[in-house]
């Protein structure tokens, strides 16, 4: 089965802030921290392991299996426009999995259009299932499985599935904009 690997990093921002640091090897044994625990330790909703391992500034859960994501989005309550959306969260504090980036999964029902919205956050959309189109400003973009496209900041956008269902993962700089008190969101009718 084909695998797609997509790294979304906050490195451009961190680089502009001159705050990029890394520990170069060789390291025979990496120090254990909470993210070295097995992912199964973080699967039970509302329950966390007590551990003497040190914390990390990101989600200690390094893998969110797609089968679990699909089950969760199927059970998610629909929004007013019929779509469903879930946030990927850090199981320790309920915050984002990366402190500066927001990650969601969005499920669209066939032939239904999401409400138009615009935000000061910049967003990357990765189509995981289905096909459809997005109206982004004055431009219509058709998409299908494995397509990647962006939503520029402060541009009206909506999505429509043309298949029975479509699922996207979205990643944005919403978290850093929120922390800088610069996040603004408008939702159309």
Describe the role of every protein-language-model region.
Residues 1, 117-145, 182:
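A short beta-strand-loop-beta hairpin characteristic of the jelly-roll/cupin
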Residues 1, 5-10, 136, 142-163, ...:
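Conserved metal-binding segment of the jelly-roll/cupin
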Residues 1-23, 125, 164-184:
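A short hydrophobic beta-strand segment most commonly corresponding to one strand
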Residues 9-12, 107-112, 128, 155:
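Short, flexible loop/turn elements at secondary-structure junctions
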Residues 21-100, 104, 184-187:
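A short, N-terminal "cap"/entry segment at the start of jelly-roll beta-barrel domains
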Residues 29-34, 111-113, 128-133, 151-152, ...:
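Glycine-rich loops and low-complexity Gly/Arg-rich segments
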Residues 83, 100-103, 121-124, 129-131, ...:
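Active-site lining segments that contact anionic ligands and/or coordinate catalytic metals
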Residues 93-102, 109-124:
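A short beta-loop-beta micro-motif enriched in histidine and acidic residues
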